[in-house]
A protein has these predicted regions:
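A contiguous, well-structured pocket-lining segment that forms one wall/lid of small-molecule binding clefts
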Residues: 32, 201-206, 216-284, 293-303, ...
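Conserved phosphate-binding catalytic cores of ATP/NTP-utilizing and phosphoryl-transfer enzymes
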Residues: 114-146, 331
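Glycine-rich beta-strand-to-loop/alpha-helix junction loops that act as flexible
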Residues: 83-87, 103, 152, 285-293
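Short beta-strand scaffold segments in enzyme catalytic cores
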Residues: 13-19, 148, 156-160
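Short Gly/Ser/Thr- and charged-rich N-terminal loops/segments
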Residues: 23-25, 131-133, 137-139, 207-215, ...
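Glycine-rich phosphate-binding loop plus the immediately following alpha-helix
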Residues: 162-204, 239, 243-249
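Conserved phosphate-binding/catalytic loops in two-lobed NTP-binding clefts
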Residues: 113-114, 284, 310-328
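N-terminal beta-alpha supersecondary unit
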Residues: 2-87, 94, 116, 120
């Protein structure tokens, strides 16, 4: 089966073709093209919805052409079209949804609507150490239940995955997502956009003295880390950074970046591990754009390996953490029984929930 995946939920235009050749679940990514809009949004320090939609409209056809050329295929070869319908920015979503519907109608192909959050989870479930170009996986019932942390610029959610297609959100951000907090702090520090990679890079340059804690001269709050629920809140952390910077005579940017990053990591890991214990999870998934953060991945792996109970840790390759068409295609395969040729049923939903 050849699946075309289309992703336009935010500011990345992603189109991919994934081959699922047998019932055992062996996947091969034939092509995975991503057109970034960083240059468009960098002057604003964040994504501007109307500009994002404009760039999607400009980029989507060239992306499709590149995807087909790299895979050496034609649209007539495609068996299923999968497209993100939400959650996300409605102007962006509409570009991808309408484009996918037009292709499905023209080439008489079945189409399936995909939840963006579920696709991030699918990317972790279907990934392996082989990486992006050619990898295999086998989804086993022994993986479940799963606790999935999906964390990006627009989302921070803890999801209980009871089985494929059975999801329950047990916690989410009440204000800023973790990735959004990175972006806003980076703007305060004039590090540019996107903020996550910039802060991560600067943080590696901080070297605390032997007699100092990691935080060095100051320590930022860990918002809601001890709350009994699994919700998150990162707007207060950004505010704490603002006031700390005002009080500092000399700003040590690497030190601030290291502390901001560690504060976010501490909260994300603490909540996830507590949820895994309560729900007796057999697997923990880390997914979404922020999952590409090397320090977050390292500390997650370390803390999970130190647990008394054996829990499998799954995280996609870094190039599958960002928004991409491959994860949409893989989610499409896992949900192929829901595909339709009634194209009017496929509608964008900016506030779509996974449960």
């Amino acid at each position: 089966m050849l699946i075309l995946g289309i992703e336009t939920s935010c500011d990345d235009t992603g189109i991919a073709i994934v081959e699922a050749p047998d019932k055992k679940g062996a996947f091969k990514i034939l092509s995975n093209i991503i057109s970034s809009q960083i240059k468009t949004h960098a002057p604003f320090g964040g994504v501007v919805p109307n500009l994002a939609a404009r760039d999607h409209l400009k980029n989507i056809e060239p992306c499709l052409k590149q995807t087909l050329e790299k895979a050496n295929l034609k649209l007539s070869n495609i068996d299923l079209i999968a497209v993100t319908i939400g959650p996300g920015l409605i102007p962006s979503l509409l570009i991808g949804v309408n484009f996918a519907k037009a292709l499905a109608y023209k080439y008489k192909k079945p189409i399936i609507d995909i939840n963006h959050i579920e696709a991030h989870i699918a990317a972790a479930l279907t990934s392996s150490k082989r990486g992006i170009s050619n990898f295999q996986f086998l989804i086993s019932k022994t993986l479940f239940p799963v606790i999935a942390l999906v964390v990006s610029g627009g989302h921070t959610q803890l999801v209980l995955v009871k089985n494929l297609g059975k999801y329950k959100i047990i916690g989410e951000t009440r204000d800023d997502a973790a990735g959004e907090c990175f972006d806003k702090v980076a703007k305060l520090l004039r590090l540019g956009y996107p903020g996550g990679p910039a802060i991560s890079k600067k943080a590696t340059k901080f070297r605390p003295k032997a007699d100092q804690p990691r935080a060095g001269n100051f320590q930022l709050p860990r918002p809601m880390i001890n709350h009994k629920n699994y919700d998150f809140s990162f707007s207060g952390l950004k505010t704490a950074v603002l006031y700390t910077l005002k009080d500092m005579k000399k700003i040590n940017v690497p030190e601030m970046c290291a502390e901001v990053q560690q504060a976010i990591i501490d909260v994300l890991i603490a909540k996830t591990l507590r949820a895994a214990k309560e729900y007796k999870a057999k697997t923990i998934i880390l997914a979404g754009g922020v999952a590409a953060n090397s320090e977050l991945r390292k500390q997650f792996k370390s803390q999970i390996s130190n647990l008394k109970s054996q829990i499998l840790f799954l995280v996609p390759p870094k190039n599958l953490c960002v928004d991409n068409g491959a994860m949409i295609a893989m989610a499409g395969y896992l949900n192929q029984n829901k595909s339709t040729k009634n194209y009017n049923k496929i509608k964008a939903d900016a506030n779509l929930r996974i449960s």
